[in-house]
Amino acid sequence: MALCHRSRPPDDGAGWVRRLVTARCRRVDGVRCTRTPRGRSEGGRWSRRDIHTRHTEKKHRHVFADGPAVVDGDRTRTWAQLYGRCAQLGDALRKQGCGRGDVVQCMLDNTAEMVEAQQGVAMSGATLGSVNTRLDAATVAYVVEHSDARLFIADERYEATCREALATLQNPPPLVVVGGQDDGYEALVESGDAAAPWTPPEDEWDALALNYTSGTTGRPKGVVVHHRGAYVQALSNAIDFGGLPADGGTRYLWTLPMFHCACPCAKEIAATAC
């Protein structure tokens, strides 16, 4: 189970994710602390190093550079290639104005692009939202509007549903389609620079992913997963699995739709080889 913060949004709904992400007050061991970036208290009474899954990405880029990272049909991407494309996507999103406190919603199947989004959105500093691909247009519209999405990335299979949903919104985010004749997603990635500098999250409690419940007892509710929670769960998986051989020979067959677990999943599986 992911370690996550559940927050009841205010009645207006707009911008609640941004307010949650940028909140500077947290409870640590039952004591309310006002923290500066990098996790030091204002009074200097406690200090620690922020932890996040960016460490594992850099490690795999160097140690398993030529090893396969993602196999999607007849497409195979090495760890070096995956890292490069994620860095490009992160830079491209920053150029689009996406950053800390913003949400990038995705409606994608289990594809290489979904894996790239899981990493690339985080590298831009933004928060990834993964929309259930089985939702109807009305519910998609609610999730996109409620999360105050800055950008919406969707597979061409769901383009019609997404356009129908966005047409009902007053201020819809731009839609980037994966596949099709134009393939706006590829154009977006190519607009980014893989060598552009990027920094880890300002705070380990910053939002990494925003997952929405199915809404069985009402409207879907947003559940925030922070960087620290994803990292700790990655270590938990490593312990549960007993560690994986570091020879790059292990393969994980992904059958669960990625939108169910969103961001942390890929990082948790990858981190077990650390």
Predicted feature residues:
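Short beta-strand->loop structural element characteristic of the AMP-binding/adenylate-forming
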Residues: 105-107, 114, 118, 122-153, ...
